[in-house]
Amino acid sequence: MKTLNSTPRADGFHMPAEWAPQTQVWMVWPERPDNWRLGGKPAQAAHVTLAKAIARFEPVTVAVSAGQYENARRQLDQPNIRVVEISNDDAWVRDTGPTFVINDHGEVRGVDWGFNAWGGFDGGLYAPWNRDEELAAKVLEMERCQRYQTEGFVLEGGSIHVDGEGTVITTEECLLNRNRNPHLSREQIEAVLRDHLAVDTVVWLPDGLYNDETDGHVDNFCCYVRPGEVLLAWTDDSNDPNYARCHAAMDVLKNTRDAKGREFIVHKMPIPGPLFATAEECAGVDQVAGSQERDPSVRLAGSYVNFLIVNGGIIAPSFDDPADAEARAILARIFPDHEVVMIPGRELLLGGGNIHCLTQQQPAPVKR
């Protein structure tokens, strides 16, 4: 694997949209006891369900620590799931894994962003994070993909959504947060995005979902469903803390054009809940200094927007909530050519994210 001194844009590469053909999806096995309750066992069962759901549509590779390899291999024993040993600090491969980029000549490379556990020592969720910092490079090494490294620039994959046609959507709450890249201006951050994603237009939503401990990742709030169309988490309850956030995002989207000059079509997705962890669920998490505390009084950032597009399928979370059926119907309407598969998302949510956060698609090579 070669680390390149250029940028994807300069070399004719771009980040494709999530609906582009994929070769596989990456996951990382959860085990961190100060984040996942009961030593991670319920979350591991949820990951098995998720991996098997994806494997119906395309191959899955699950990275796992040496200590958990035998356990994971036993539970994931089926033909379309590969288990590989990679040391890690936690399971959030959307944020720690590489952002894959492609060109028109059948090549796939990867961007290795800086990672500081969502804020480093200024609001970050755990320390140390050095094994997570190395994960993207190891994935690219395994896949024989050349690597672009953004030294000194922190970004998580969950903080961006692209349409593959020149536009990226993100949030000010995350990318302009002082605990990510305080040495860079908004314009400088946009320049990095343009160079490494090969986009021309950056759409800045003010905030993400209320109480999202990643500082408002866009993938839990608003996502592309096709060029010019997005799905936005929504509530009509003016007493909900998300009300102002949803309406502010809608104002931006309604008054913005994408890189192709299109107005946005915005589909609304109801927000489940409000959802909270139980005292029993919180008690199952080890309390460790420097790690995110779990508290039953703190609202969980549950969202149906946190789904994954795979080849021919939509893998989405359910929450045993009255809005589950409506969420399924909305996804089926928006993606008529995909099979919508909903799996229980509560155990994933208890750890601080959901399906999209815990997966990373690898696009297929394209020759034009």
From Swiss-Prot:
Reaction catalysis annotation: agmatine + H2O = N-carbamoylputrescine + NH4(+)
Active site (UniProt): C357
HAMAP family in the cross-refs: Agmatine_deimin
One example of a Gene Ontology biological process annotation: putrescine biosynthetic process from arginine
Organism taxonomic ancestry: Bacteria, Pseudomonadati, Pseudomonadota, Gammaproteobacteria, Pseudomonadales
Gene symbol of the encoding locus: aguA
Role, per record: Mediates the hydrolysis of agmatine into N-carbamoylputrescine in the arginine decarboxylase (ADC) pathway of putrescine biosynthesis, a basic polyamine.
Subunit organization: Homodimer.
Alphabetized InterPro entries for the sequence: Agmatine_deiminase, Peptidyl-Arg-deiminase_porph
Organism: Pseudomonas putida (strain ATCC 47054 / DSM 6125 / CFBP 8728 / NCIMB 11950 / KT2440)
EC number: 3.5.3.12
Recorded superkingdom: Bacteria
Keyword field: Hydrolase, Polyamine biosynthesis
Gene Ontology molecular function: agmatine deiminase activity; protein-arginine deiminase activity
Family to which the UniProt record says this protein belongs: Belongs to the agmatine deiminase family.
Keyword Hydrolase: yes
UniProt name for this protein: Agmatine deiminase
Pathway listed: Amine and polyamine biosynthesis; putrescine biosynthesis via agmatine pathway; N-carbamoylputrescine from agmatine: step 1/1
